[in-house]
Regions:
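Hydrophobic positions on the alpha-helical face of helix-turn-helix-like DNA-binding modules
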Residues: 27, 40-42, 52
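Intrinsically disordered, low-complexity basic tails/linkers immediately adjacent to helix-turn-helix/homeobox/MYB/SANT
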Residues: 69-80
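Residues within the DNA-recognition helix of helix-turn-helix
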Residues: 55-58
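C-terminal flanking helix
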Residues: 60-67
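Short amphipathic alpha-helical boundary/capping segments
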Residues: 11-20
């Protein structure tokens, strides 16, 4: 994942993280903030790599949906 996308998702996680499930939030924090690999996250949560990939994908989609509907990050960045 590119650094730009990582920073963007980390910002969305900071704003909308409480709206995710506890598991999705923890997986995203591990992936984005702690820079753990998908394998490491799977081992820590006792799930398969595919389950981690699915959780990341669903969480990314939810975070983007919240931003599309609410637009807090755009407002914080001074965009319209």
């Amino acid at each position: 994942m590119s650094l730009e996308k990582n920073l963007y998702l980390a910002s969305l996680l900071d704003l909308y993280g409480p709206l995710l499930s506890a598991t999705q939030r923890q997986v995203m924090e591990d992936y984005l903030l702690k820079d753990l690999t998908i394998t490491e996250i799977g081992q820590n949560h006792d799930v398969s790599r595919q389950a981690v990939k699915d959780a990341i994908s669903k969480a990314e989609a939810k975070l983007q949906m919240y931003e599309n509907k609410l637009g807090f990050l755009k407002r914080l960045n001074g965009e319209r």
